[in-house]
């Protein structure tokens, strides 16, 4: 179960919700998870306990909600899944070896990386005009100094272009940024991409 890197996964709620209906999705990038590469469900006898992250709940609800289901109970199911599948593996690291540390550190990374404000400062905002994938990638490399992984949903019938879905930043085992390896699942094609604005 040895893993080599962590992947900080941000997703864009409008794209997630385009696939399914959501009520009032956040209009900012939220956390999908902090995932060790190449492993899952490392310890089935370490159940998720919401009491351990009580102090983190206000931030969890804001930055790590279950975008598809707005009820708070659903977010607990989502966090349980993330802990059982990914957190139990991440816990190999001292910095992440409890539920409080795993969720707390992920929130810290989210705030430090500040993807939302970074994209805005770069002038990359949700728009009905399209962006070029290469422009988004190069802009992010300029800020973070590493190559991110940008993931898209392919165009559905009637759509002209792919839709921006997730942005991943990769970290070493000592939580330093590193290049994300190419390629991967659902990676974006070169060319135009739609970064969907919130529905009115």
UniProtKB/Swiss-Prot annotation:
Record has Nucleotide-binding as a keyword: no
Catalytic activity: a ribonucleotidyl-ribonucleotide-RNA + H2O = a 3'-end 3'-phospho-ribonucleotide-RNA + a 5'-end dephospho-ribonucleoside-RNA + H(+); an adenylyl-uridine-RNA = a 3'-end 2',3'-cyclophospho-AMP-RNA + a 5'-end dephospho-uridine-RNA; a guanylyl-uridine-RNA = a 3'-end 2',3'-cyclophospho-GMP-RNA + a 5'-end dephospho-uridine-RNA
UniProt keyword list: Disulfide bond, Endonuclease, Endoplasmic reticulum, Glycoprotein, Hydrolase, Immunity, Innate immunity, Lyase, Lysosome, Mitochondrion, Nuclease, Secreted
Active site: 32, 82, 86
GO terms under cellular component: endoplasmic reticulum lumen; extracellular region; extracellular space; lysosomal lumen; lysosome; mitochondrial intermembrane space
GO MF, any single term: RNA nuclease activity
Cysteine disulfide partners in this protein: 17-22, 42-89, 152-188, 170-180
UniProt-listed Enzyme Commission number(s): 4.6.1.19
Subcellular location: Secreted; Lysosome lumen; Endoplasmic reticulum lumen; Mitochondrion intermembrane space
Pfam families: Ribonuclease_T2
Glycosylation sites per record: 43, 73, 116
BP GO annotations: innate immune response; RNA catabolic process
Entry superkingdom: Eukaryota
Keyword Secreted: yes
Function: Ribonuclease that plays an essential role in innate immune response by recognizing and degrading RNAs from microbial pathogens that are subsequently sensed by TLR8. Cleaves preferentially single-stranded RNA molecules between purine and uridine residues, which critically contributes to the supply of catabolic uridine and the generation of purine-2',3'-cyclophosphate-terminated oligoribonucleotides. In turn, RNase T2 degradation products promote the RNA-dependent activation of TLR8.
Membership in a protein family: Belongs to the RNase T2 family.
Full protein name: Ribonuclease T2
